[in-house]
Amino acid sequence: KVNYTLSEDLREASLTVVNTGGKLDSRSPIEIQLTKDEMKAGSYLETILINSVNLIDSSIYTYTLNGIDSARNVADEYTVSSIHYDITKPVIDLIEPTENGALNSALVTYDFSETMLQTDLTITRIGGTPDTLSPHNVEVVMYELAAGRVDSAIITNAPTSTDGAIYRYEFKGVDLANNASNVIVADNVLFDNT
């Protein structure tokens, strides 16, 4: 999908897509000719061009839009670089705490298959000692969103859990391309620090 605005109707226009990194796209450069309807003056939002092609997941591209109007004036080309094409859903693995496990501190171990834009870690009391602040919606921030495994970490915004409470941990998120992750749940986690 592309977004673009044309100030006037064009006689000719093309979008050139060049693979500049990530996975190799052997078809690069790809030249996509715009159709007559796609060359009319106006704004185009989230548009799938008629002659578009499937790109390669995990490739990085540069897009350049060129055009000529009916008087054969050449428009200034417009280029957008470093477009990371990503259609793969990220995977979150919550390693610690484990379902039916116990914790004596707010340590968690998790693994992200790729860097996340945002994650939601919700810790909800489901039994044991009452926790009047439950559910805890934990904001995972900055370096905590990086791809890879994080071992036995106390998340920056970790809540204070209640001794003797039993919790459900639910972890989900979206990657930099807004692909939604799986939802991972660990039920019946006892917090016991005495």
How would you label these PLM feature ranges?
Residues S7-E12, F112-Q118:
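Short proline/glycine-enriched turn/loop motifs at strand-loop junctions of beta-rich domains
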Residues T79-D93, D175, V185-T194:
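Flexible, low-complexity linkers/stalks enriched in Thr/Pro that connect modular domains
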Residues T98-N104:
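Short, solvent-exposed loop/linker segments at the N-terminal edge
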Residues K1-V2, N104-V108:
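Structural beta-strand segments of beta-rich domains
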Residues A71-Y78, A177-I184:
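Beta-sandwich strand segments
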Residues E38-I50, V141-I155:
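Aromatic sugar-binding surface patches on proteins
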Residues S52-I60, T156-I166:
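Surface-exposed, short loops/turns at beta-strand junctions within beta-sandwich domains
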Residues L65-G67, F171-G173:
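Conserved structural position at the C-terminal beta-strand
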